[in-house]
């Protein structure tokens, strides 16, 4: 393990996009370690310079890391983390950008325009879908492994007009395949009881964002769920439905998770835990949540 360490959000385009920015700047001078949300810090983090991108540890863990290491810098954009860490001077939050864009600015300065690759990542991560041909482009990006060489290739293709057209054609084919699979999975939708309320859900490790959003929108509920069993518990993605003002992160945080207003996640040991909070909340608030 090298003296410079980047810890970044594992199995996430935004997290890997953050790594890509740091690796372009520091190359082999830095160790790059993917970290799953909720997992403890890797062993051996002492006397290091540490950067944490696209996620945050709980406050107590961050303070221990700060005490044991030369420096620590957190670059994050998750609302639920900012609520508890914003007073720490080594934590930097900006809800208007994704982790990869924030990492780009950190590594390159605010005056250097982020590449299209990262702008598309942000469009998906913040659940905006405002970039042209976003679904086609992101279908291609999502089909590639997390590899520095492959992401350099993706970045190059998006900047070349001819290759961009090829990108769109490839994305259209991938979208057809994805939509077919999503329809097959969606047909198995059901409901789960969350704090006494029936919430539409789909059991799938694939296309969780799309499925959670779709079940909510078609059922007309405040939010929808997509989940899968990872061998240790049930991992949930939660997306807002037609009520765009509803803050799904408020639900996720009650199970020890977090995220954004429109897109969040959490994990429970058993499905019956969906009626039990991991964090203490006032009884009146729980009652209000059941009936609002």
Predicted regions mapped to residue ranges:
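Active-site metal-binding loops of divalent metal-dependent hydrolases
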Residues: 11, 37, 54-55, 77-78, ...
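Short N-terminal binding/cap micro-motifs at the start of the first secondary-structure element
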Residues: 12-19
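A broadly used, surface-exposed interaction patch
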Residues: 59-87, 92
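Short alpha-helices
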Residues: 79-148
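N-terminal small/polar loop signature for handling phosphorylated ligands or for N-terminal nucleophile
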Residues: 5, 19, 23-25, 29-72, ...
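Glycine-rich, Lys/Arg-enriched anion-binding loops that position phosphate/diphosphate groups
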Residues: 119, 126-208
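Gly/His-enriched, cation/cofactor- and phosphate-binding structural elements
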Residues: 2-4, 48, 179-292
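Divalent metal-coordination and catalytic microenvironments
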Residues: 22, 54, 76, 103, ...
């Amino acid at each position: 393990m090298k003296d410079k360490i980047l810890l970044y959000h594992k199995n996430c385009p935004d997290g890997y996009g953050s790594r890509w920015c740091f690796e372009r700047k520091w190359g082999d001078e830095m160790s790059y370690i993917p970290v799953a949300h909720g997992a403890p810090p890797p062993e051996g983090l002492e006397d290091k310079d540490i950067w944490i991108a696209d996620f945050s540890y709980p406050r107590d863990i961050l303070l221990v890391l700060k005490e044991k290491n030369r420096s620590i810098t957190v670059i994050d954009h998750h609302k639920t983390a900012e609520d508890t860490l914003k007073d720490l001077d080594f934590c930097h939050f900006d809800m208007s950008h994704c982790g990869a864009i924030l990492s780009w600015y950190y590594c390159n300065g605010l005056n250097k325009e982020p590449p299209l690759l990262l702008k598309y990542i942000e469009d998906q991560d913040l659940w905006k879908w405002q970039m042209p041909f976003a679904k086609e482009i992101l279908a291609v990006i999502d089909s590639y492994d997390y590899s520095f060489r492959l992401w350099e290739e993706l970045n190059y293709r998006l900047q070349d007009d001819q290759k961009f057209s090829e990108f769109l054609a490839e994305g259209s084919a991938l979208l057809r395949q994805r939509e077919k699979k999503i329809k097959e999975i969606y047909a198995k939708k059901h409901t789960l009881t969350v704090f006494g309320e029936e919430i539409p859900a789909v059991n799938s490790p694939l296309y969780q964002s799309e499925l959670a959003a779709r079940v909510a929108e078609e059922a007309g509920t405040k939010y929808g769920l997509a989940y899968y069993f990872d061998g240790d518990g049930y991992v949930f993605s939660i997306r807002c439905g037609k009520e765009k003002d509803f803050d799904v992160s408020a639900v996720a945080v009650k199970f020890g998770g977090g995220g954004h207003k429109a897109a969040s996640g959490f994990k429970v040991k058993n499905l019956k835990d969906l009626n039990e909070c991991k964090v203490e909340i006032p009884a009146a608030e729980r009652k209000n949540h059941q009936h609002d």
